[in-house]
Regions:
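Short low-polarity hydrophobic stretches
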Residues: 1-3, 174
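Membrane-interface helical sensory segment of bacterial ECF anti-sigma factor regulators
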Residues: 3-55, 148, 157-159
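Conserved beta-strand->loop/alpha-helix structural units within folded catalytic cores of enzymes
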Residues: 41, 53-73, 100-101, 194-210
């Protein structure tokens, strides 16, 4: 009689095709998951790096506008010493009034912020602000006029008088930065904790700690630990648009 057929490991096509299909899908899913795990941090880093570059470019534009204003007036835009328009963010309408900034080109917005996503941001004119004094609309205008950036609150002299922000181009003296949260402890627009600072001389610096290591000076607090105007010419606190000196 003929020998019995040798045992074969082959599986009938009816059984093997679905099995291979399921296995292929599992392998593809696992590969996609692994790629996501590996690439997601890189993608987030790339997004944050792009946002940082754009913020630094915006500070470059603002530095040029501020220096142009200072060249003409021998001081930087300074808020009134008192009154409803005595706000950090008044620098923006002041620069727009002299055609040094464009009201609606997004220079004052951090990419991805709520203001930038609204698509409606526009720096109000000084006349709009004056007309809004005494109305509920004023608070909305002063909160938004400075965009996503904060501005120096200047300093007061020994008698308590608010002083003009002089054009001395100091390389260690902040004039603008990312706007602080309302508690004045850190910036609000960068998830990583990054702070961008524009100094008087036009230099832009990135820091993760708003307290300067060399002298323990706080970016958003004066030497008395308050979010208010400085107590001497070397004291600087950066306030959000609506903050008063």
């Amino acid at each position: 009689p003929p020998p019995p057929p040798a045992f074969s490991h082959e599986v009938s096509p009816a059984l093997s095709a679905p099995t291979r299909s399921v296995l292929d899908r599992v392998i593809l899913a696992a590969t996609a998951l692994a790629a996501t795990v590996l690439l997601a941090p890189l993608l987030l880093d790339s997004i944050e790096a792009s946002r940082t570059r754009r913020v630094e470019q915006k500070f470059g534009v603002l530095s040029g506008a501020l220096h142009g204003y200072a060249d003409s007036h021998r001081e930087y835009p300074t808020p009134p010493a008192s009154g409803p328009l005595s706000r950090a963010g008044l620098y923006a309408p002041t620069l727009v009034a002299e055609h040094r900034l464009t009201a609606d080109d997004g220079t004052l917005l951090v990419p991805g912020s709520s203001l930038s996503q609204s698509g409606t941001f526009r720096i109000p004119s000084v006349e709009e602000l004056e007309e809004a004094v005494g109305t509920a609309r004023l608070e909305m205008l002063v909160r938004q006029m400075g965009g996503d950036f904060g501005y120096t609150l200047s300093h007061r002299d020994a008698s308590g008088e608010l002083q003009p922000i002089r054009d001395t181009r100091r390389g260690h003296h902040p004039i603008m930065a990312d706007a602080p949260a309302d508690h004045g402890l850190h910036a609000i627009h960068h998830p990583s904790g990054l702070h961008h600072i524009l100094f008087e001389d036009g230099r832009v610096q990135r820091v993760f700690d708003p307290v300067f290591a060399e002298d323990q000076d706080h970016l958003y607090r004066n030497h008395n630990g308050v979010l208010a105007a400085g107590v001497d010419p070397d004291d600087s606190a950066i306030g959000s648009s609506h903050h008063q000196p």
